[in-house]
Curated annotation (Swiss-Prot):
Keywords: Methyltransferase, S-adenosyl-L-methionine, Transferase, tRNA processing. Its EC number is 2.1.1.282. InterPro entries: Taw3, tRNA_yW-synthesising, tRNA_yW-synthesising-like_sf. One of its GO terms (biological process) is tRNA methylation. Coiled coil: none annotated. SUPFAM superfamilies: SSo0622-like (SSF111278). Belongs to the TYW3 family. This is tRNA(Phe) 7-((3-amino-3-carboxypropyl)-4-demethylwyosine(37)-N(4))-methyltransferase 2. Pfam families: TYW3.
Amino acid sequence: MKAKREALQSLFTAMRDGKVDGDIIDLLLLINSIKGIYTTSSCSGRIGIIEEPALGAKPLSRWLIKVHRPIEFEEAKEALKNAKEGIIFLKSQPPIFHVVAEDLEKARKLHELGLASGFKYTTFKVISKRYLVEINATEYLTAPLGRDGRVLVDDGYLRFAVEIGNEMLRRSKGRLPRLEENFRRLREELGTDELFYELVEEYKIRENWELP
């Protein structure tokens, strides 16, 4: 699969450059070692403070702070000092994985796997003749905090929003072990991909990461 080769090259380069969320590297390696599937953009889950120039204007938004672990109240409060323009939100988002399957049968297996792992927003669609499965959970939080540099909530509200956002992040990340276990079972069923191990050697992945 030419597309898988390109996706793996992109992933391994990003790993070397420190641009991949560390707590899902093992899982990404596992998924990509499976024959007939590969990952594209994925995230281990995150929480942070973001400015959006207008509702839904994601391309022009600016993160004031973004972390892939529970955030501290003081971190959030300090980040708000850098707010300038737009609507200010605290956002908590669950892990998300985009996985491409080479055929409809594998896409269906991935869809069932995501749902069985507790990722209830898992869907799949056909894009440019590719079967793309989005493994996604339900724990999303968007809490408005202010506008145009003005924080319109008190510390009590901010602390509460941070607490709820962190709890949602922990809960969604807590499903990752089950997801990994189910992908291991899928690998036993579908087999491993020689291309993956070929590129592992080319990019010297074993020097820094243990293969699943």
